[in-house]
Amino acid sequence: RNPDDIELEKIFLRDFRLAMNLIGQRDKLEARLNIGKSFSYSTNRFEIQNYFNNLFNRREKRICIDYETTGLNAYSNEEKVISVAISDGVSTVVFMIEDYIDLFIELLCFSYLDKIAQSAGFEDKWSRRLIKDAGKDVGSFVPFSQDILIKSFLLNGRVGVNNLEFLVWRYFGIEFKGEVDRTKIAREAEGALLKYNAQDAFYTYWLNEEFLNFAERQLVH
């Protein structure tokens, strides 16, 4: 700590308040640390079908949707979505997009879901691309309503501290490093790709919960 360095002092005070807040909420701290232990995912066809059925039957449910794509440009015909993961923080399913494209597009247009994304702009563009390529009405798409990158930036605008790996380490104490090379994602083994995709959705869901809880605590105080 250096009180003469104004910027460092701001960082120290912010992190000190965070630490003291956690000390006063040991039960929540333990819950945070246990999040990584609760991660699991399914690629089972029966479980995926059942997952979709439950989402359509349960309204006002919050879920995270995460895409793995061959590139960033949703408007390029050379790039595409390869796989999709969906997580409600308890159960996570992941699949190759071509296996469930019709059901998934129906889900994107389902208005009773609160959809979380790492970056809503990115996921929105690819969602519209999927709907358009399937010959469906893009106007029926219901946009993502939660964006964790925007929330994390509002909480901490420093450069380099808002990527998913850092956020997972900071908030949950988990060293989360993807096991795939994103520059060669189209050639990755399917098993490794699906696990990576599932982790993204699961941790994004819980980061969003963390940010929402933080906002609620600030309103109370």
What is each PLM-predicted segment?
Residues E60-C64, E106-L107:
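A short linear-motif detector with a strong N-terminal bias
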Residues R62-S76:
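Short acidic, Gly/Ser-rich segments with clustered Asp/Glu that frequently serve as metal-coordination loops
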Residues N2, L13, R17, I23-Y41, ...:
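Active-site-proximal helix-loop-helix substrate-binding element of RNase H-like nuclease domains
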Residues D27-R62:
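N- or domain-start disorder-to-order transition segments that initiate the globular core
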Residues N2-L8:
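A short acidic/glycine-rich loop-to-helix N-cap element
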